[in-house]
Amino acid sequence: MTLARLAPLAALLLAACAQFQPPPPEPDPLPDLMRQQTSLPQGGGVFTAGGSLSLTSDNRAFRPGDVLTVVLEETTQASKQAGTSFGKKSGAKIGPSLIGNTTFNAQVGIDANRDFNGSSSSTQQNALAGSLTVVVHRVLPNGLLQVKGEKQLTLNQGEEMLRVAGYVRVEDIDTDNRVSSLRIANARIGYSGSGALADANSPGWLMRFFASPLMPF
């Protein structure tokens, strides 16, 4: 009987000791870097159509294997509010008479009143600034560039990982071979970290105990 009483408490303690693991990264939507196909020069020529550069062209990326810099300018802000209120009131009153004589007036009254008020609000704001150099992995038939890149920093207090993937138009690349992250289509931008600094942002075991889904309150 004692073990049956301690079983719910043990389940709550085990849930509190569970670590909050970050969600695993999503599969990379872009393929691996494709090998550039170059044709052999014909007629004793020196330059090839797939690998030569025009003297009048700029240095913007437009072929598989080229690199370009993505300027991160991400800012998101969300706000949501909700409120609910309803009430109900009802009453009944009965005054019976005794054989047509109102001398005996036994009044019976029933009243019911219910009220409910609820409100909620949520606000979230995120910002990410910086730069990351990515590699062109493929050129689509319509000229879009599939780009992908990542940066991993190993610090004395942990590791940080930054990943960027998506599709870029050549027209959106400036003369310094840079493109804004706001111009990337189907952008996949991820920033994560591990170590002492990341652990400092996670709640302790007692807070996880009260935030457990098994908590009845």
UniProtKB/Swiss-Prot annotation:
The keyword Lipoprotein applies. Residues 1-16 form the signal peptide. GO terms for molecular function: cytoskeletal motor activity. One of its GO terms (biological process) is bacterial-type flagellum-dependent cell motility. One of its GO terms (cellular component) is cell outer membrane. A lipid is attached at residue 17 (N-palmitoyl cysteine). InterPro entries: Flag_Lring (IPR000527). It comes from the Bacteria. A lipid is attached at residue 17 (S-diacylglycerol cysteine). NCBIfam families: PRK00249.1-4. PANTHER family: FLAGELLAR L-RING PROTEIN (PTHR34933:SF1). Belongs to the FlgH family. HAMAP family: FlgH. This is Flagellar L-ring protein 1. It comes from Chromobacterium violaceum (strain ATCC 12472 / DSM 30191 / JCM 1249 / CCUG 213 / NBRC 12614 / NCIMB 9131 / NCTC 9757 / MK).
